[in-house]
Amino acid sequence: MIDQSKLIERWKTTFETAQNPTELLAFKNSFRNADLKPLLSQIKETTDIETKRHLGQLYKQLESTLQTLHDTQLQVFTQAQSSSVLTHGDVMLLATSFAPGSSNIIYQVIDELVNYFKKFLFTVNYDSELTTIADCFDLLNIPKDHPSRNLTDTFYLDKNRLLRTHCTAATLRAVKETKKSNNPDIRIASFGAVFRKDDDDATHSHQFNQLDFMWIKKDFSLTNLKWFMQNMINHIFGENTSARFRLSHFPFTEPSFEIDIRCWLCQNGCGVCKKTRWIEVLGAGILHPQVMANMGFSDTDNIRGIAAGIGIERLVMLKHGISDIRDLYDNNFKFLAQFTD
């Protein structure tokens, strides 16, 4: 059992020994890893509802206290620095030191995904954000009356070119190019920015990041898809993460699935999972025969493809408990400093 008062006193005493803001931030990150992460793991593993609720409240209290202690001591440094500059300093002098940088949490998750796909010998593809109607819609079996083709949903440059609405367009081009070498086992993953005419709010953005993959091989089946996706979910969210596959519909896969993970904050439903006990993560499926034919594969060869599209920001928000997607883009250093790698 955590002795809350002793833990907070240890944090406070240690923060007061910091010599500068960089060391102060290092202390805070150390405390998060050593004291709070084990508690979060305990919450995920606990099955008793009351225990989970109690530990969740304790985690929120400790996290808030840690941030408050850090901010209080940081204010001491800020005031001392301002006083020193105003009294003695030459404000025109160049800075003698800079705070160390760190990769953004979006790219931390992209790196995790890229490392996962590289373990399975995928070619990782980063292509142009500009694409054609054929690659973005026609060759992916998206009908001409589909809402995503509308001018109100997509950024068109002219009658044939547009900003891609998904990374599948890049993956499709790479697969067609790779097929020219008669490779019997094609593994392509693409990532990058995609664009949609959405109004920016807590869960939507007109520009966000996506990772898409296709793995095409003889005799592939749903078993291969479920095995591969479950392993990827475990890689991102931790071993033994429960996942379920719900039948859905996408024009480019048949059958199609929405993949959900078990909500780690509750047992009987909460605000995060909208009382369903499950949280939607991504879409996947077996590539539609028409899409396979459009890429030059013959149905008689019994070649099948598995595919999925993954919203990076959604994974980041789920992984770190972030409720507003705009927080990822606002360049709030205080917010971003919590997730230094």
From Swiss-Prot:
GO terms under cellular component: cytoplasm
Statement: the UniProt record of this protein carries the keyword RNA-binding: no
Documented EC number(s): 6.1.1.20
Example of a GO MF term: magnesium ion binding
GO biological process assignments: phenylalanyl-tRNA aminoacylation
Main location: cytoplasm
Cofactor comment: Binds 2 magnesium ions per tetramer.
Cofactor(s) the record lists: Mg(2+)
Keyword list, A-Z: Aminoacyl-tRNA synthetase, ATP-binding, Cytoplasm, Ligase, Magnesium, Metal-binding, Nucleotide-binding, Protein biosynthesis
Location in the cell: Cytoplasm
Coiled coil: none
Protein residues bound to Mg(2+): E254
Matching PROSITE patterns: AA_TRNA_LIGASE_II (PS50862)
Catalytic activity: tRNA(Phe) + L-phenylalanine + ATP = L-phenylalanyl-tRNA(Phe) + AMP + diphosphate + H(+)
CDD domains to which the protein is assigned, alphabetical: PheRS_alpha_core (cd00496)
Database matches in PANTHER family: PHENYLALANINE--TRNA LIGASE, MITOCHONDRIAL, PHENYLALANYL-TRNA SYNTHETASE
Family: Belongs to the class-II aminoacyl-tRNA synthetase family. Phe-tRNA synthetase alpha subunit type 1 subfamily.
Subunit structure: Tetramer of two alpha and two beta subunits.
Name of protein: Phenylalanine--tRNA ligase alpha subunit
Native organism: Mycoplasma pneumoniae (strain ATCC 29342 / M129 / Subtype 1)
